[in-house]
């Protein structure tokens, strides 16, 4: 139960502390490590504000898109909800790589190793393509079955729309992976404002789709909304990355 879980975690903490004290004393902070200047505080504060604003804008875009979906009927909403849950699960490899990549980039920024950043980004982009291929194969064989499993529905509209959402989105996983890796990498390189613009592109794109395309093309527009926006965002972010002075210094 919960008591056992808490006890196990407590034991893990004690063992980790003992191991650090015995074998990895370099991780123990000293007095000199606690002396930080105002520059570091400002850097952390401004970066957190940038990331917070980006998340807020992304959430606002999701609310706008949901407003457009709500007028398409309960069965369409049910299929879309199931598909989004599956999408949130299948894009975890991309999000995990982007998070790991941001740490890798920031460490090599501190170590002044731009060549390692370039090589790491290329490998992350290739990884995104591999995830895309796996997603396409998975959705081609199991999209409708997975929607039925998640939704618990046998309604043809629910299964068809949910499966179509997954099938049409899967080929764009490579674009999404490049988008996430590049945006997180730019933030790790100290870029605060330029990555924020990508979220503005997303918000504006979703507003346009809700006002113009969804009323005309119905759920097809909902399916293509995010993949098309991802393409614009990725093009912008990659252009910013290719002009990043640390990664690509002018000779």
Model-derived segments and spans:
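Conserved catalytic core of Hanks-type protein kinase domains
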Residues: 20-21, 59, 71, 140-141, ...
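Small-residue-enriched core segments of transmembrane alpha-helices in multipass membrane transport
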Residues: 85-86, 200-209
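Short alpha-helical transmembrane segments in multi-pass integral membrane proteins
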Residues: 2-3, 7-49, 105-172, 213-251
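Transmembrane alpha-helix boundary and packing residues in multipass membrane permease domains
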Residues: 51, 55, 63, 67, ...
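Hydrophobic faces of transmembrane alpha-helices in multi-pass small-molecule transporters and flippases
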Residues: 10, 15-18, 33-64, 69, ...
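Alpha-helical transmembrane segments and their helix-entry boundary regions
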Residues: 2-4, 77, 192-196, 222-223
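Small-residue-rich hydrophobic transmembrane alpha-helices
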Residues: 79-143, 176-190, 194-198
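Helix-terminus/linker motif at the lipid-water interface of multi-pass membrane proteins
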Residues: 56-89, 107, 145-155, 212, ...
């Amino acid at each position: 139960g919960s008591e056992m879980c808490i006890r196990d975690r407590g034991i893990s903490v004690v063992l980790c502390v003992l191991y650090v004290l015995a074998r990895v004393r370099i991780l123990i902070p000293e007095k000199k490590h606690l002396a930080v200047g105002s520059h570091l505080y400002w850097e952390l504060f401004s970066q957190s504000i940038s990331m917070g604003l980006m998340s807020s804008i992304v959430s606002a875009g999701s609310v706008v898109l949901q407003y457009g979906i709500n007028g398409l009927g309960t069965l369409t909403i049910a299929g879309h909800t199931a598909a989004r849950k599956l999408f949130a699960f299948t894009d975890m490899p991309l999000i995990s790589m982007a998070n790991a990549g941001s740490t890798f980039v920031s460490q090599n920024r501190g170590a002044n190793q731009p060549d390692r950043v370039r090589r790491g980004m290329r490998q992350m982009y290739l990884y995104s393509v591999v995830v895309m291929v796996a997603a396409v194969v998975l959705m081609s064989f199991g999209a409708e079955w997975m929607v039925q499993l998640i939704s618990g529905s046998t309604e043809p509209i629910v299964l068809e729309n949910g499966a179509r959402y997954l099938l049409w989105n899967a080929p764009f996983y490579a674009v999404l992976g490049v988008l996430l890796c590049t945006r997180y990498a730019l933030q790790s390189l100290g870029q605060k404002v330029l990555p924020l613009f990508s979220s503005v592109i997303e918000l504006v794109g979703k507003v346009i789709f809700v006002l113009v395309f969804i009323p005309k093309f119905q759920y097809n527009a909902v399916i293509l909304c995010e993949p098309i926006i991802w393409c614009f965002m990725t093009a912008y972010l990659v252009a910013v990355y290719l002009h990043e002075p640390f990664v690509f210094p002018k000779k």
